[in-house]
Regions:
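Hydrophobic residues in beta-strands and at strand termini
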Residues: 94-96, 135, 144
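Feature for mature exported/ectodomain regions
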Residues: 1-75, 80-123, 161-166
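Polyanion-binding catalytic cores of nucleic-acid enzymes and NTP/SAM-utilizing transferases
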Residues: 126
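Extracellular adhesion/glycan-binding regions together with long Ser/Thr-
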Residues: 71-78, 137, 142-146
Length: 166
């Protein structure tokens, strides 16, 4: 995985996110999901991914197939909900110039969901879940169910990865 990009590159790879929630019969529970810029949190997640072989394997890296993974885009999200239904549909979207360069339209994308947990001593650890997104019109779209989002909690980071052969 590449080292921390320069400021110019960081501006190029800057992502923006959005979220849409729909429920049964169009009923939307009281949910507010916002994309946020959290550089420190994203840095911690990237450190985890670069140093954890099991996590890389879960994301698609394989010694046998000689494949590695490359992080293409990250986006932190914050969710406030009082009544998210388990069956509700939550669509998270990540937009970045990198996506158009890295993926074909309609390509399936492995997305790691990094969920922070603060221990009693103040240290933060992350639990990772793997979901699949899809590239639609140059954006990565991840469709989740309400029960998944509730599991992730109020604060999480989506990390899109690309498997690279060779």
């Amino acid at each position: 995985l590449a080292a921390t990009p320069s400021k110019t590159v960081a501006d190029e790879v800057k992502a923006s996110g959005s979220a849409t929630v729909t429920g049964v019969l169009g009923i939307v529970s009281d949910v507010k999901v916002t994309a946020k810029e959290d550089t420190a949190q994203v840095e911690e997640v990237l450190q985890d991914i670069t140093s954890d072989a099991d996590l890389q394997k879960a994301a698609g890296a394989s010694k046998e197939k000689k494949t590695t993974i490359d992080v293409t885009v990250t986006q932190a999200f914050e969710m406030q909900t009082s009544n998210l239904l388990d069956a509700a549909n939550v669509k998270l979207t990540i937009e970045s110039k990198v996506i158009e360069a890295a993926y074909e339209d309609n390509e399936q994308v492995t997305v790691l969901v990094a969920v922070p947990k603060t221990k009693a001593d103040g240290t933060v650890t992350y639990t990772y879940y793997t979901v699949t997104g899809k590239v639609v019109d140059g954006e990565i779209v991840v469709n989740l169910k309400g029960r998944q989002v509730k599991l992730y909690g109020s604060n999480f980071v989506l990390v899109a990865v690309k498997t690279i052969e060779g």
